[in-house]
């Protein structure tokens, strides 16, 4: 126990020293940062101060110019006002002349008005006769309209009486039905209200019991969580102390625990289940696709050749690729001789094509065969499906399609190599043929 106390006291002393060093470091760094912040604020505000002084100087000059302009404007306004007074006196003389003209025009208008009155008297007498004739016609038309209105009112009153009779009959028929529906609705409402009251009466004790259980669980959880940290710290301190003072005892405990774990049949069953799941995962179709794609990317240097060299037959390459994809789960157990044989099978179509091209005379070749070979040369060297549309830089090899280039560029930088010359790919360029 004394050794435990010594270790605990030593740890406390070390923590105090570390706290003191951290406080001194924080004080020094904070003072240095404060001085740097003050210096930066001074340097930062110096241009602003200079600009503010220049701005105030410009404002003073601008205000003096505005005062000078205001004096000039006021002087100009006084001159214009005097000129306007002179013009107003001239206008008064013109007004007197205008008054004389108005007097002459008034005399002419009065004479014309007298003439118009005579003409209007003649016209008004004719208009009175015409108005009397129109009144007679209006009285006759009003009598005719009264007769027609009376007939229409009689028809409307008869129709209204007929509709009121039909409504009375409908009310007499549907009234009892509505009363029956009201009684049924009131009965159902009474039953539902009594059921709700019974449910509330039964729910109150259940709610009290649930609240009591929740409060007890909350109290227990708070007690466990408060004491859990202390228990964990005590267990950690005891484990470290036992490990430091008695390492042999710790090793014996570990070996005994491992032996007991290996002796349990459940451990072996769990291990067998994990191995079976790993075999199923490795034998799945998705894992086969991923493994075949990785093997295709790894076999690029074996597929490549010089730029423009004829590639192997697509059907043979596809058959070899299918065979390799079917044997992926047993790839870890295949020998080196089988891998060498598969590599030889993959490279054989290319060499056979080159040998046939060397044996055939230049003049006796079939043009359709040449065209087919030319189309095959345009295919991607990896998938043998799409056309070559991407130029690799700086090696300048046109050998990949867009999809294979995207898959290649997803790899790390040190794996981005040309499949023909194995040089690093720094940039790609799309080519449209």
From Swiss-Prot:
InterPro entries: RNF26_mRING-HC-C3HC5, Znf_RING, Znf_RING/FYVE/PHD. It catalyses: S-ubiquitinyl-[E2 ubiquitin-conjugating enzyme]-L-cysteine + [acceptor protein]-L-lysine = [E2 ubiquitin-conjugating enzyme]-L-cysteine + N(6)-ubiquitinyl-[acceptor protein]-L-lysine. It is a multi-pass membrane protein. GO terms for biological process: endosome organization; negative regulation of defense response to virus; protein K11-linked ubiquitination; protein localization to perinuclear region of cytoplasm; protein ubiquitination; regulation of type I interferon production; ubiquitin-dependent protein catabolic process. A zinc finger (RING-type) spans 380-422. The keyword Zinc-finger applies. GO terms for cellular component: endoplasmic reticulum membrane. Pathway: Protein modification; protein ubiquitination. The chain crosses the membrane at residues 24-44, 60-80, 147-169, 183-203, 220-240. E3 ubiquitin-protein ligase that plays a key role in endosome organization by retaining vesicles in the perinuclear cloud. Acts as a platform for perinuclear positioning of the endosomal system by mediating ubiquitination of SQSTM1 through interaction with the ubiquitin conjugating enzyme UBE2J1. Ubiquitinated SQSTM1 attracts specific vesicle-associated adapters, forming a molecular bridge that restrains cognate vesicles in the perinuclear region and organizes the endosomal pathway for efficient cargo transport. Interacts with INCA1. Interacts with TMEM43, ENDOD1, TMEM33 and TMED1 to form a complex capable of modulating innate immune signaling through the cGAS-STING pathway. Interacts with UBE2J1; this interaction is important for SQSTM1 ubiquitination. This is E3 ubiquitin-protein ligase RNF26. It comes from Homo sapiens (Human).
């Amino acid at each position: 126990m004394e050794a435990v106390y010594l270790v605990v006291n030593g740890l406390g002393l070390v923590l105090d020293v570390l706290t003191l060093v951290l406080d001194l470091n924080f004080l020094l760094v904070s003072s240095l940062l404060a001085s740097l912040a003050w210096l930066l604020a001074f340097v930062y505000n110096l241009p602003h101060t200079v600009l503010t002084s220049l701005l105030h100087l410009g404002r003073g000059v601008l205000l003096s110019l505005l005062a000078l302009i205001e004096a000039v404007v006021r002087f100009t306004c006084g001159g214009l006002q005097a000129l306007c007074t002179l013009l107003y006196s001239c206008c008064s003389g013109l007004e007197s002349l205008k008054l004389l003209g108005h007097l002459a025009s008034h005399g002419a208008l009065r004479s014309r008005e007298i003439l118009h009155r005579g003409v209007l008297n003649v016209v008004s007498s004719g208009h009175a006769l015409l108005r009397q004739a129109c009144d007679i016609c209006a009285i006759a038309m009003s009598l005719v309209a009264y007769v027609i209105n009376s007939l229409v009112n009689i028809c409307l009153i008869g129709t209204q009486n007929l509709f009121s009779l039909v409504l009375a009959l409908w009310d007499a028929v549907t009234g009892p039905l509505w009363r029956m529906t009201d009684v049924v609705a009131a009965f159902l409402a009474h039953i539902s209200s009594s059921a709700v009251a019974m449910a509330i009466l039964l729910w109150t004790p259940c709610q009290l019991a649930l609240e009591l259980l929740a409060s007890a669980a909350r109290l227990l959880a708070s007690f466990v969580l408060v004491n859990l940290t202390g228990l964990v710290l005590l267990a950690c301190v005891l484990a470290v102390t036992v490990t430091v003072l008695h390492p042999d005892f710790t090793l014996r405990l570990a070996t005994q625990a491992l032996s007991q774990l290996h002796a349990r049949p459940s451990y072996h069953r769990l291990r067998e289940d994990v191995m079976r799941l790993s075999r199923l995962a490795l034998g799945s179709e998705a894992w086969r696709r991923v493994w075949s794609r990785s093997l295709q990317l790894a076999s690029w240097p074996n597929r490549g050749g010089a730029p423009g060299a004829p590639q192997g037959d697509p059907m043979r390459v596809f058959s070899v690729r299918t065979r390799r994809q079917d044997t992926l789960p047993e790839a870890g157990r295949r020998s080196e001789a089988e891998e060498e044989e598969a590599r030889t099978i993959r490279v054989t179509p290319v060499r056979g094509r080159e040998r046939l091209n060397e044996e055939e005379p230049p003049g006796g070749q079939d043009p359709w065969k040449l065209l087919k070979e030319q189309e095959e040369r345009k295919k991607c060297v990896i998938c043998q499906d799409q056309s070559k549309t991407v130029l690799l830089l700086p090696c300048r090899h046109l050998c990949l399609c867009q999809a294979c280039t995207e898959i290649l560029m997803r790899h790390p930088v040190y794996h981005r190599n040309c499949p023909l010359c194995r040089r690093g790919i720094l940039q790609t360029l799309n080519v449209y043929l």
